Amino acid sequence: MSSSTPFDPYALSEHDEERPQNVQSKSRTAELQAEIDDTVGIMRDNINKVAERGERLTSIEDKADNLAVSAQGFKRGANRVRKAMWYKDLKMKMCLALVIIILLVVIIVPIAVHFSR
């Protein structure tokens, strides 16, 4: 090697061509490096996916909290409506009972007065 070129441990030298084991070793090293690079890429993708999933989980938690608050409001409103309808139904039953009593009085009183003479 000349002194003008920097030392490269992966570059083939004149002596390496004579030894096929060294070439096989370097190709195996290159294969391993490619596998490592692929693994690193996959791990980075997985880390990004975990981060996205964490953001989505936070969003889902916020939506669940909002839903719980809405459910409580709905329950209170439903109870108010139920009580209002019960009171309205009670008033209707009382009016119906009053009408029946008035009709009975209108029918029975003249008959009673007529037979009492």
UniProtKB/Swiss-Prot annotation:
- Locations listed in the record: Endomembrane system
The segment(s) forming the v-SNARE coiled-coil homology domain are 28-88
Q: Where is the lipid attached (S-palmitoyl cysteine)?
A: C95
Please provide the record's keywords in A-Z order. Answer: Coiled coil, Isopeptide bond, Lipoprotein, Membrane, Palmitate, Transmembrane, Transmembrane helix, Ubl conjugation
Q: Which domain of life is it from?
A: Eukaryota
Q: Which residues lie on this side of the membrane: Cytoplasmic?
A: 1-94
Annotated stretches, region: Disordered? 1-30
Q: Which GO terms describe its cellular component?
A: cell periphery; cellular bud; cellular bud neck; cytosol; endosome; endosome membrane; Golgi membrane; plasma membrane
Q: Which CDD domains match?
A: R-SNARE_Snc1 (cd15874)
Enumerate the SUPFAM superfamilies for this protein. SNARE fusion complex
Could you tell me which residue ranges are on the Vesicular side of the membrane? Answer: 112-117
Query: Which spans are transmembrane here?
Result: 95-111
GO BP terms, alphabetized: ascospore-type prospore assembly; endocytosis; exocytosis; Golgi to endosome transport; Golgi to plasma membrane transport; Golgi vesicle fusion to target membrane; intracellular protein transport; retrograde transport, endosome to Golgi
Q: Output the Gene Ontology terms for molecular function.
A: molecular adaptor activity; SNAP receptor activity; SNARE binding; syntaxin binding
The protein's matches in Pfam families, at most eight in alphabetical order, are given as: Synaptobrevin (PF00957)
* Described purpose of this protein according to its UniProt entry: SNC1 and SNC2 are vesicle-targeting proteins essential for normal secretory traffic between the Golgi and the plasma membrane. They may also be involved in vesicle fusion.
Q: Tell me the protein family, please.
A: Belongs to the synaptobrevin family.
Q: What's the protein here called?
A: Synaptobrevin homolog 1
Q: Which organism is it from?
A: Saccharomyces cerevisiae (strain ATCC 204508 / S288c) (Baker's yeast)
The uppermost taxa in this organism's lineage are: Eukaryota, Fungi, Dikarya, Ascomycota, Saccharomycotina
